[in-house]
Amino acid sequence: MSIIVNQIVLHQLVKTSQDENTVQLKTHLRDELLPITAETEQMMLQLHQEYHNKTKAYGVFQETSNFAQILNRTLENDIDFLAFSHQSAELLRQELGKYSFANDGTLILCQYNFLATDYLFIALLDSRYSMLVDENLEIKQTHYLDITQFDIACRINLTELHLDAKSTRYLTFIKGRVGRKIADFFMDFLGAEEGLNPQVQNQCLLQAVSDYCQQADLTKEQTQAVKKQVFDYCKGQINVGEEIVVRELSANIPTLNEQSFVDFAVSQNYGLEENIPPVRTALKSLTKFSGSGKGITLSFDAELLNSRIFWDEATDSLTITGLPPNLRDQLQRQTKE
């Protein structure tokens, strides 16, 4: 798959001083865009792929967003991309300086096209140090731009923003490993607030599937069979990197009480999006029971309940018949010691 880079530029944020709560940063700005070469396109393709694999949250611009105003002026050709990047770098410097975790970094802004969709990608990348051997077989220190490990990044789907300004998913940003501060910082920089919540959408989907089966008075086995079909479809979408298409999902499961699943979901006002980003951990509950606590971790297929695994609510206990062989072997070895 190819990527078409339309405009790209790099700037740097340099830390000059730091006190207990804030950091002083300055910007080092390029005065022209980067030339579009095979190297820049290869770098952007790798950044695109790395970003795709990261855990992301969705956002939408607030009405008072300074960043959105600058972006709109750029899209309307009131200012060029270089001027947009300079103003964005200054906004980022001001916002990032409020946080103690702020550090030096290379700011990349790129407008590109991938699979007939226009994107704006923004990331703050770290530089790493390593060693190299030169032509004289001498060892020297070098530093390079780390385009595989980054936490401060966002991407705006410009095509979706243009076609549907009320969309709740045109903006995504990385949910950083260092906690809420990264998410809060980037939301403030962008002037954005939470948009689509994939976890909530997945939970609503699961509830809709459960209610759909219940209103049709299906048996336990029939209900589990429908849930297995739903899970198989969703798992297939995850495997190919696609979203759950509710209408497509509906076509993959039986019509109950002469009403398709998609029509049932709409009539009951579950608030499901037409396309839903799948959350693997949430979808597992379609076919499995799982939980952990007090030193115990359990996970088993839902179809085993009341066949090999029995729950006694009164005594808050589970009875398991037919232990997994590897678990039985561990227990036998332990009792012999």
UniProtKB/Swiss-Prot annotation:
Signal peptide residue numbers: none
Keyword Hydrolase: no
Domain of life (superkingdom): Bacteria
Molecular-function GO terms, alphabetical: double-stranded DNA binding; single-stranded RNA binding
One GO cellular component term: cytoplasm
Listed Pfam families: NA37
Chief site of localization: cytoplasm
Record's subcellular location: Cytoplasm, Nucleoid
Keyword tags: Cytoplasm
Keyword Zinc-finger: no
Sequence similarity: Belongs to the YejK family.
Name used for this protein in its record: Nucleoid-associated protein HS_0228
Source species of the chain: Histophilus somni (strain 129Pt) (Haemophilus somnus)
Lineage: Bacteria, Pseudomonadati, Pseudomonadota, Gammaproteobacteria, Pasteurellales
